[in-house]
Amino acid sequence: MTARSGHPILQLDEVVHQRVRLGILAVLAEAEKVDFTHLRDVLGVTDGNLSRHLSVLHEAGYVETHKTFEGRRPRTWIVATKLGRRALADHLAALRELIAQVGEP
């Protein structure tokens, strides 16, 4: 068992656990900031799908967005917050613990 309460499955963050949101935070863990278009292309999702998942992460306080202009072109940058980076680290720790507890088949 974990020092935290309960089974490791109970420690998984439902906001982070969804595949696209986990991917967003994983990409952001490797960079200080990421352009919306790059993130969309890396994750293989539509603009609308990515926007929706970013909204969920933003509501949880896990990401922030910053809009800039390059010439006349708008550009949206996504940044993981300290809380978002901590949520990803905690989620990955819970996954590791779950895998260790279940073992290999």
Residue positions per predicted region:
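Short, hydrophobic-biased segments on the C-terminal half of alpha helices
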Residues: 54-55
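Glycine-centered, phosphate/nucleic-acid-interacting loop/turn motifs that mediate DNA/RNA or nucleotide
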Residues: 61
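Amphipathic alpha-helical dimerization/coiled-coil segments
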Residues: 1-9, 26, 82-105
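N-terminal helix-turn-helix DNA-binding core of bacterial DNA-binding proteins
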Residues: 8-49, 68-79
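Short beta-strand "wing" residues that participate in macromolecule-binding interfaces
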Residues: 65
